[in-house]
């Protein structure tokens, strides 16, 4: 038996649309992500458990886990009869890499179960392919940090897919999911097909500056440069009151904030735990729309996916 945990992640991290992603873990030590258990069986079987298992498709062949299993078997050219348990603890369409959690956990679990026929690069490529089939385009800004941990710079080069970027150890990342859903495909469709040259240059300048500030450990400069000129101006239509919320948490003391992935989760950053707790309390009171929503104060998760049992 193999049991794997895969953490939630923040896609884009503001300034890096489809280029940056960060794995997160609550500071209280709890695990925010999905679990996948693989056992030997005489045929494929899938059991869905967890808080959000009722949101998964009833048809097994529409489940991400089945798609991962099939693609893995096709890749290694072997039919592996297994029983898989998915503990779906991440809300679907939340902007926290929910699909990436299931994809990464399943593919790593299958690879471990089969004595690692695929290397890490081959696995990551497979993860990106499955993510692309679900969201409409291959992108690694959730699967890479979920798999590798930390803050990842997505290069998508033929030899190097992703590189780890230094982060700031004293940053608290507050993530707030309101309890609603924004499908990734819908959030991508709302974006323009073309951008002005000036916009592209400005975004490139800020992204380059953020990478430089991360390596030179200038937290205030990095926070100031975490601005999204590519997706946020258009996706705010999908997030009612987003600009109001962003302004309020800035007044409380957030040094940066933005939309996590496609939303509706938002993230904010503080370098002070007391301020982080105040932001968390305000978001809990004002951003959550139902009882399933949540707010977590997190660190970046440097471990990424890991074996639990």
Swiss-Prot record:
Enzyme Commission code: 2.7.1.39
Keyword check for Repressor, yes or no: no
For the protein in the UniProt heading, the enzyme class is transferase
Q: Identify a single GO molecular function assigned to this protein.
A: ATP binding
Gene Ontology CC annotations of this record = cytoplasm
Signal peptide limits? none
Q: Where, in this chain's numbering, is ATP bound? A: 91-101
Gene Ontology biological-process entries: threonine biosynthetic process
Q: Which family does it belong to?
A: Belongs to the GHMP kinase family. Homoserine kinase subfamily.
Q: Which pathway or pathways does this protein act in?
A: Amino-acid biosynthesis; L-threonine biosynthesis; L-threonine from L-aspartate: step 4/5
**Which PANTHER family does the protein's record reference?**
HOMOSERINE KINASE, HOMOSERINE/4-DIPHOSPHOCYTIDYL-2-C-METHYL-D-ERYTHRITOL KINASE
- Location within or outside the cell: Cytoplasm
Reaction(s) catalysed by this chain, per the record, are:
L-homoserine + ATP = O-phospho-L-homoserine + ADP + H(+)
Q: What does this protein do?
A: Catalyzes the ATP-dependent phosphorylation of L-homoserine to L-homoserine phosphate.
- Identify the species of origin: Buchnera aphidicola subsp. Acyrthosiphon pisum (strain Tuc7)
PROSITE patterns membership: GHMP_KINASES_ATP (PS00627)
Q: Where mainly found?
A: cytoplasm
InterPro entries listed in its UniProt record: GHMP_kinase_C_dom, GHMP_kinase_C_sf, GHMP_kinase_N_dom, GHMP_knse_ATP-bd_CS, Homoserine_kinase, Ribosomal_Su5_D2-typ_SF, Ribsml_uS5_D2-typ_fold_subgr
- Corresponding gene? thrB
Looking up Pfam families in the UniProt record yields: GHMP_kinases_C, GHMP_kinases_N
Task: State the UniProt keywords alphabetically.
Answer: Amino-acid biosynthesis, ATP-binding, Cytoplasm, Kinase, Nucleotide-binding, Threonine biosynthesis, Transferase
What Gene3D superfamilies does this protein map onto? Answer: 3.30.230.10, GHMP kinase, C-terminal domain
Report what the protein is called.
Homoserine kinase
């Amino acid at each position: 038996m193999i049991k794997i945990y895969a953490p939630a992640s923040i896609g884009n991290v503001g300034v890096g649309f489809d280029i940056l992603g960060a794995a997160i873990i609550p500071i209280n030590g709890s695990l925010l992500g999905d679990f996948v258990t693989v056992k030997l069986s005489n045929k494929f079987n899938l059991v869905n458990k967890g808080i959000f298992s009722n949101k998964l498709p009833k048809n097994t062949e529409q489940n991400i886990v089945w798609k991962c299993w099939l693609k893995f078997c096709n890749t290694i050219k072997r039919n592996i009869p297994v029983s898989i348990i998915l503990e779906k603890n991440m809300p679907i369409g939340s902007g926290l890499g929910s699909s990436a959690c299931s994809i990464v956990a399943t593919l790593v679990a299958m690879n471990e179960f089969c004595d690692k026929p695929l290397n890490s690069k081959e696995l990551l490529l497979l993860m990106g392919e499955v993510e692309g089939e679900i969201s409409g385009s291959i992108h690694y800004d959730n699967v890479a940090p979920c798999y590798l941990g930390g803050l990842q710079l997505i290069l998508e080069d033929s030899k190097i897919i992703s590189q780890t970027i230094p982060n700031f150890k004293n940053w608290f990342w507050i993530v707030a999911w309101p309890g609603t859903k924004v499908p990734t495909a819908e959030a991508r469709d709302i974006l323009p097909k073309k951008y002005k040259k000036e916009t592209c240059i400005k975004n490139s300048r800020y992204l380059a500056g953020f990478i430089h500030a991360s390596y030179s450990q200038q937290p205030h400069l990095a926070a100031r440069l975490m601005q999204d000129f590519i997706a946020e101006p258009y996706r705010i239509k999908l997030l009612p009151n987003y600009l109001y919320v962003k302004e309020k948490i800035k007044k409380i003391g957030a040094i940066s904030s933005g939309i996590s992935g496609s939303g509706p989760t938002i993230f904010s950053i503080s370098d002070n735990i007391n301020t982080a707790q105040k932001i968390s309390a305000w978001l809990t009171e004002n951003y959550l729309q139902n009882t399933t929503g949540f707010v977590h104060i997190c660190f970046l998760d440097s471990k990424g996916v890991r074996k639990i049992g």
